[in-house]
Amino acid sequence: MEKKNIILNLIGLRCPEPIMVIRKTLRKMKKNEKILVLADDPSTKRDIPYFCYFMEHQLLDRFIHVKPYRYLLKKG
């Protein structure tokens, strides 16, 4: 069974909306599925790593040098 790739475009959303949308999306996903998050809110550089840590998801990679910021998450 092929896994689908999920890209979540959160450009234009401001805190706390990006985390709320990520959480809602991850709840619908299965364990070990991956999601690519695109965001431009500077607070995501702090919020997404903490969110992953506390919710026991993995932050596999992040690209935060230029906008849009990109985060690759794996559901825990």
From Swiss-Prot:
Instruction: Keyword check for Manganese, yes or no.
Output: no
GO molecular-function term, one example from the UniProt record: sulfur carrier activity
**Pathway the protein takes part in:** tRNA modification
GO cellular component terms, A-Z: cytoplasm
Give compartment(s). Answer: Cytoplasm
Q: Which UniProt keywords apply?
A: Cytoplasm, tRNA processing
What top-level branch of life does the organism fall under? Bacteria
Say yes or no: keyword tRNA processing present: yes
Name the InterPro entries on file. Answer: Sulphur_carrier_TusA (IPR022931), TusA-like (IPR001455), TusA-like_sf (IPR036868)
Q: Name one GO biological process term.
A: tRNA wobble position uridine thiolation
Per the Swiss-Prot or TrEMBL record, the active site comprises C15 (cysteine persulfide intermediate)
Q: What is its main location?
A: cytoplasm
Instruction: Relate the protein's function as given in its record.
Output: Sulfur carrier protein involved in sulfur trafficking in the cell. Part of a sulfur-relay system required for 2-thiolation during synthesis of 2-thiouridine of the modified wobble base 5-methylaminomethyl-2-thiouridine (mnm(5)s(2)U) in tRNA. Interacts with IscS and stimulates its cysteine desulfurase activity. Accepts an activated sulfur from IscS, which is then transferred to TusD, and thus determines the direction of sulfur flow from IscS to 2-thiouridine formation. Also appears to be involved in sulfur transfer for the biosynthesis of molybdopterin.
Entries under HAMAP family matching the protein:
Thiourid_synth_A
Indicate the quaternary assembly.
Answer: Interacts with IscS.
Concerning its family, UniProt says: Belongs to the sulfur carrier protein TusA family.
Q: What is this protein called?
A: Sulfur carrier protein TusA
Organism this protein belongs to: Buchnera aphidicola subsp. Schizaphis graminum (strain Sg)
Query: Gene encoding this polypeptide?
Result: tusA
